[in-house]
From Swiss-Prot:
Belongs to the sirtuin family. Class U subfamily. It holds the Pfam family SIR2. The lineage of its organism: Bacteria, Bacillati, Bacillota, Bacilli, Bacillales. This is NAD-dependent protein deacetylase 1. NCBIfam families: PRK00481.1-3. Zn(2+) binds at C123, C126, C142, C144. It comes from Geobacillus kaustophilus (strain HTA426). It comes from the Bacteria. The keyword rRNA-binding does not apply. The active site is at H115 (proton acceptor).
Length: 242
């Protein structure tokens, strides 16, 4: 059996996407020293509640940079193919560690965002939400007087309970679980493939570098761009089910 045949036969495919999915769109990642965001900022210090209140200027500069960078990038072929696979009933759920909103922009509808979204900001006091571009125009406080912050999970904050529950349920239902561009170092996302495997799912990992779960996977692909691999799989799917 091949990845293509598993995709064709699957009744419930769940996809987990990580930073590698976003970097192919040109977005810098958090975890690459001297590249990505570490070249200009220290995310472990600035992406925190403490920085929001006590290093406000640096916090705002950091997230203005991230929002501006996001506006300059767009979904790639991999995002668009996953959306197409959802429309065709090949993919049922996408769980993402990314905050860029590219899956939704590409057309995916069933997306679970574990770490929130950089597409909106919200008030720490009243919870009112606004499009994140207002941050670029210096709108940093809410009408109620509360502090506005990006709607992402900051270091030290709990992940949204609803997203975790939905992701866990999706993993339990999966008969095929694809990992795309995740190093599987961050919990609880790195537990989802294990949940799927325990429930009998096939596990496929496509990531540039090896992961700690590679030995448990039914298929592993390294050193390949995700968009290219998905394009190849899509072409093979057309041959399996023309």
């Amino acid at each position: 059996m091949t990845i293509t045949s598993w995709l064709a036969a699957s009744r419930h495919t769940v996809v987990l996407t990580g930073a590698g999915m976003s970097t192919e769109s040109g977005l810098p990642d958090f975890r690459s020293p001297r590249t990505g965001l570490w070249a200009r900022f220290n995310p472990s210090e600035l992406a925190t509640i403490d920085a929001l209140y006590h290093r406000r200027e640096s916090f705002v500069e950091f997230y203005q940079y991230r929002i501006r960078t996001l506006q300059q990038c767009q979904p790639h072929d991999g995002h668009r193919l996953l959306a197409d696979w959802e429309r065709r009933g090949i993919v049922q759920t996408i769980v993402t560690q990314n905050v860029d909103g590219f899956h939704q922009e590409a057309g995916s509808r069933r997306v679970i965002e574990l770490h929130g979204s950089l597409r909106t900001v919200h008030c720490q006091r009243c919870g009112e939400s606004k499009p994140s571009f207002v941050y670029l125009h210096g709108v940093l406080t809410c009408e109620c007087g509360g502090v506005l912050r990006p709607s992402v999970v900051l270091f030290g904050e709990p992940l949204p309970e609803k997203a975790i529950t939905e992701a866990w349920e999706a993993a339990q239902q999966a008969d095929l679980f694809l990992v795309l561009g995740s190093s599987l170092q961050v919990s609880p996302a790195n537990q989802l493939p294990l949940v799927a495997k325990r429930n009998g799912a096939k596990l496929v990992i496509i990531n540039w570098e090896p992961t700690e779960l590679d030995d448990l996977a039914d298929a592993v692909i390294h050193q390949r761009k995700i968009g290219e691999v998905l394009n190849e799989l899509n072409e093979q799917l057309a041959e399996v089910d023309p």
